[in-house]
Swiss-Prot record:
<comment type="similarity">
    <text>Belongs to the thioesterase PaaI family.</text>
</comment>
<dbReference type="InterPro" id="IPR003736">
    <property type="entry name" value="PAAI_dom"/>
</dbReference>
<dbReference type="InterPro" id="IPR029069">
    <property type="entry name" value="HotDog_dom_sf"/>
</dbReference>
<dbReference type="InterPro" id="IPR006683">
    <property type="entry name" value="Thioestr_dom"/>
</dbReference>
<protein>
    <recommendedName>
        <fullName>Putative esterase AF_2264</fullName>
        <ecNumber>3.1.2.-</ecNumber>
    </recommendedName>
</protein>
<dbReference type="InterPro" id="IPR011973">
    <property type="entry name" value="PaaD"/>
</dbReference>
<dbReference type="Pfam" id="PF03061">
    <property type="entry name" value="4HBT"/>
</dbReference>
<dbReference type="InterPro" id="IPR052723">
    <property type="entry name" value="Acyl-CoA_thioesterase_PaaI"/>
</dbReference>
<dbReference type="GO" id="GO:0016289">
    <property type="term" value="F:acyl-CoA hydrolase activity"/>
</dbReference>
<keyword id="KW-0378">Hydrolase</keyword>
Amino acid sequence: MRCSVTKFFCSTAKKSQMVERVKDYMYKNDKLFELLDARILEMKEGYAKVEMVVKKEHLNAANVCHGGIIFSLADLAFALASNSHGKLALAIEVSITYMKAAYEGEKLVAEAKEVNLGNKTATYLMEVKNSANKLIALAKGTVYRVNEDFPPTS
């Protein structure tokens, strides 16, 4: 009994360390964080939450947040969640539906949740909400899980 409890805690600690390594690596190396001025709010295996504030440079010709910016925020959460297992995950399909416009000055939060984890593929649902907790966009993405450690060790 004692051995299995120790194994559980060791395994949980290793998973937590892996998530932190992925989080740190992605934040430092994915230039989209800097471009969007986005930050990671929360991350664990199969889950991530990121936020940004809509700025003037994020607006389209209709003076609302460009759909590509909203998609990019959802994609950041998707990338974090899908790579959180320490195995390189590359998007093979992503779709998004926009529900509501976002405006300059609004805080947007994207949350990615794992709905299926297989050996080769995994699927995630992403929601983007504003500070009033209104749904701005809903996305679904699938990744191919490459047989490579992530982040790279070298």
